[in-house]
């Protein structure tokens, strides 16, 4: 038996990495009976049959899992936004952050296309990123001349997953980091201000102290797994200040003696962050139940 990590999955074949050696494996029939499928990122135990082939016997417990796209055991989720084409959006960023925290993922923010961004817009984005840094997020704003290898190797060890909407430059970023990957890229649609999907599956690529993965771009974000009363926990500053609200279940909207509303009034919480919280709270409160 060998133990390794699934780094690629295509048509029911799972490529497992064991210290740089790759094995094409398939899950035993037991998994089909349990209606359980391995995903990229899983740590598995498998039996070798023939050269570099085998059958998966066990999938070890996942510490976390992203549902769309399916990838597990993520150490850091890098939310990739572009400054322009498509334009930087704090609302979209906040939604990505909520998704990340709902899956217990550590998140950091990478903004691309600095070299294509007017100076005034660069200043505006830098000021917004300072707000996110004060909340507790690591952020970076990069252009075409920045050394991708230096950036990636400075990130935490383990599995790094790049996530973001289509067209923000995830595949381009990886091509600069590892030119031999030659990942497909596409220009954005001028009419829609968003990109076309070029990455169609998740694949892990080795880096100095772990792995890095590109993921298919999002055209929509799914909040079906999140309850309205959980959202406040995924806005980190609301969660922090909410600990001293009068009521433990305070949603920071109309409740009396709300510390979050007080911190908002004195400027310790950014108005746009609170507005995005309210929008998402109302959106989830009013969603229709799916049967």
UniProtKB/Swiss-Prot annotation:
Record note on cofactor: Binds 1 zinc ion per subunit.
Annotated GTP binding sites: 112-115, 164-172
GO cellular component: cytoplasm
Keyword RNA-binding: yes
Subcellular location as annotated: Cytoplasm
Domain of life: Bacteria
GO terms for biological process, alphabetical: ribosomal small subunit biogenesis
Domain CP-type G: 63-221
Keywords, comma-separated and alphabetical: Cytoplasm, GTP-binding, Hydrolase, Metal-binding, Nucleotide-binding, Ribosome biogenesis, RNA-binding, rRNA-binding, Zinc
UniProt cross-references to CDD domains, sorted A to Z: S1_YloQ_GTPase, YjeQ_EngC
Record-linked Gene3D superfamilies: Nucleic acid-binding proteins, P-loop containing nucleotide triphosphate hydrolases, Probable gtpase engc, domain 3
Disulphide-bridged cysteine pairs: none
Main location: cytoplasm
Positions bound to Zn(2+): 245, 250, 252, 258
Cofactor: Zn(2+)
Broad enzyme group: hydrolase
EC number: 3.6.1.-
Assigned protein family: Belongs to the TRAFAC class YlqF/YawG GTPase family. RsgA subfamily.
Oligomeric form and interacting partners: Monomer. Associates with 30S ribosomal subunit, binds 16S rRNA.
Functional note: One of several proteins that assist in the late maturation steps of the functional core of the 30S ribosomal subunit. Helps release RbfA from mature subunits. May play a role in the assembly of ribosomal proteins into the subunit. Circularly permuted GTPase that catalyzes slow GTP hydrolysis, GTPase activity is stimulated by the 30S ribosomal subunit.
Family matches, as NCBIfam families: ribosome small subunit-dependent GTPase A (TIGR00157)
Protein name per Swiss-Prot or TrEMBL: Small ribosomal subunit biogenesis GTPase RsgA
Organism the protein comes from: Staphylococcus aureus (strain N315)
Originating gene: rsgA
